[in-house]
UniProtKB/Swiss-Prot annotation:
Group of enzyme by EC: transferase
Domain of life: Bacteria
GO biological process terms, semicolon-separated: rRNA base methylation
SUPFAM superfamilies: Nucleic acid-binding proteins (SSF50249), S-adenosyl-L-methionine-dependent methyltransferases (SSF53335)
Organism: Aquifex aeolicus (strain VF5)
Location of the active site: 381
Pfam families the record matches: tRNA_U5-meth_tr (PF05958)
Residues annotated for S-adenosyl-L-methionine binding in this entry: 260, 308, 354
Name of this protein: Uncharacterized RNA methyltransferase aq_257
Length: 425
């Protein structure tokens, strides 16, 4: 079967950006397919329960199919659904989200309120990680860890793309450069970089690169090494933070802290979370980062605590509370589990959770059900783990009251959503 081309009718798009089909009763996941198409595909992986394939020829095309604007699409692994027009991307993401909640979450009536589209289909990302391999600057292929050399990335902010020729110049003097991470502020026009290298880079050399090779809006570079899957900072030259502005709020964001990637939706995202949360007396913001939600939420309640396991993020969050003149918010360097455990027995009206793609840990779900806050605002970036968590939380006494999809990641399979859960009457 692996050498023989398959003829497949694609039923729908599924999480991961694959077209879903069946052949002789077996599930087939087809890369670069569109819903309702007839395609010819080549098998790339054969498993007992399913097959993975890639489109080689479109026999009957979907009206939603388009020529991908990016010349690297089909090689580069950064985008999965660029061959679909944006309307179809949103429709498919909505279908995947709702189907996940019904099938996995066992939620029969989903109070879905619609999608918030990105204000830009392209050039929306203000954080980018360039991979470097044999003088190629770009991103890994979708099928192997081989870097596709690019002149620009259509998802990256235009300013970030301006850095690519400068990175090529840096490669002439730092031969073992493996990655360059860019963190850019479109509201202040400033950026910090992480250089990930095998060996320690000379500090004077890095200072010279900052002053003479990179554009003046790059305000700092951190030198990092890899230890396992983690990055360890050796030292920095220049500043190690930039500032972002979202409406009236200011945020300091250090090189090791996280900030929302799609700058075109910052204000919308914040507005929706504030709207879902409403007023409260005491709140917790778990996975709080630099206080993106926590600090504005402090205006709507008497007191709120933010927790995050990242020490850099907590330092930024504490600084951000000061520059925004908020004195009813405190931050703690702790995992969500540890922070919740310390709050057992306390009356909590609101908990905001924004977990990684793996969703909430079992221990975190257990503590939420034990503490029973009046409201949980759940920000999800994975509909399958989100549905799993909702199934457990709704069985434990919560009801899903509101749900919206916010498309922070156009051209990719990633699905972000905001949900409100309240204790059942």
């Amino acid at each position: 079967m692996k050498d023989k081309p398959l003829k497949l009718t694609v039923e729908k798009l599924v999480y991961g950006g694959y077209g879903f089909s069946r052949l002789n009763g077996k599930a087939v996941f087809v890369r670069f397919a569109s819903p309702k198409e007839l395609v010819e595909a080549k098998v790339v992986k054969e498993k007992k329960d399913y097959t993975e394939a890639v489109v080689t020829k479109v026999l009957i095309s979907s009206p939603a199919r388009r020529k991908a604007p990016c010349p690297y699409y089909g090689e580069c692994g950064g985008c999965q659904i660029q061959h679909l027009n944006y309307e179809e991307q949103l429709r498919s993401k909505k279908d995947i989200l709702l189907e996940s909640l019904e099938r996995i979450g066992k939620i029969k009536e989903v109070p879905y309120e619609g999608e918030i589209p990105s204000k830009k289909e392209f050039n929306y990302r203000v954080r980018v990680q360039f991979k470097i391999q044999e003088n190629r600057v770009g991103f890994y292929r979708w099928d192997v860890k081989e870097v596709v050399d690019v002149e620009e990335c259509l998802l990256a902010h235009e300013r970030i793309n301006e850095l690519i020729p400068h990175i090529r110049e840096v490669l002439k003097v730092i031969k073992d450069l493996q990655e360059v991470h860019v963190n850019y502020s479109p509201t202040r026009d400033e950026a910090t970089l992480k250089f990930v290298t095998i060996t320690h880079t000379d500090e004077k050399l890095l200072q010279n690169i900052l002053e003479n090779v990179l554009p003046e809006w790059v305000v700092g570079i951190g030198d990092y090494g890899k230890v396992g899957n983690s990055l360890v900072k050796r030292y920095k030259v220049g500043r190690e933070h930039i500032f972002m502005d979202v409406g009236k709020w200011q945020y300091r964001v250090s090189n090791d802290s996280f900030f929302q990637v799609n700058y075109t939706l910052w204000e919308d995202f914040l507005k929706e979370v504030l709207d879902f949360s409403e007023s409260y007396k005491k709140g917790l913001d778990l996975h709080c980062g630099v206080g993106f939600f926590t600090i504005p939420l402090s205006e709507q309640g008497n007191f709120i605590e933010g927790a995050d396991a990242n020490p850099s993020a907590i330092k930024d969050a504490e600084y951000n509370a000061k520059i925004n003149n908020r004195d009813n918010v405190i931050f703690e360097e702790a995992t969500a589990f540890k922070h919740l455990k310390r709050r057992i027995g306390e009356v909590i009206n609101l908990v905001v959770v924004d977990p990684p793609r793996s969703g909430l840990l079992r221990e975190e779900r257990d503590l939420l059900l034990k503490n029973k806050p009046d409201k949980i605002v759940y920000i999800s970036c994975n509909p399958t783990t989100f549905a799993r968590d909702l199934k457990i939380l709704t069985k434990g006494g919560y009801e899903l009251k509101r749900l919206k999809l916010i498309d922070n990641f156009p051209q990719t399979y990633h699905i972000e959503s905001i949900a409100l859960l309240e204790v059942k009457d």
